Amino acid sequence: MPLSDWCCGICEEAPLGRAYTQTWMETGCGPHGVTALGQQELKDCLRARSGGTASSVDWIMEAARGSLNVHNCLIKFGRRD
């Protein structure tokens, strides 16, 4: 699946309607947000998506607009918008 689609699926089904693996949901997202493993995967994902840096997550917020779970995970990840 395209990397951008995977990134948009953090913590829940993607806004595009694609479902992501239960394994990632169990290991990457805890009850209070992204777990340590999930944070590393998110960092790797952001780095790959942005061409080498993880300085901005604006694109994922745009893609996941209206998605409370994704927003909560990003807050846990350390960015507040």
UniProtKB/Swiss-Prot annotation:
UniProt-annotated location(s): Cytoplasm
Domain of life assignment: Eukaryota
Membrane-spanning ranges: none
Tissue: Expressed in placenta, heart, lung, liver, pancreas, skeletal muscle and brain.
Disulfide bond annotation, renumbered to this chain: 7-73, 8-29, 11-45
Gene Ontology, cellular component aspect: cytoplasm
Keyword terms, alphabetized: Cytoplasm, Disulfide bond
Protein name: Putative chemokine-related protein B42
Species of the source: Homo sapiens (Human)
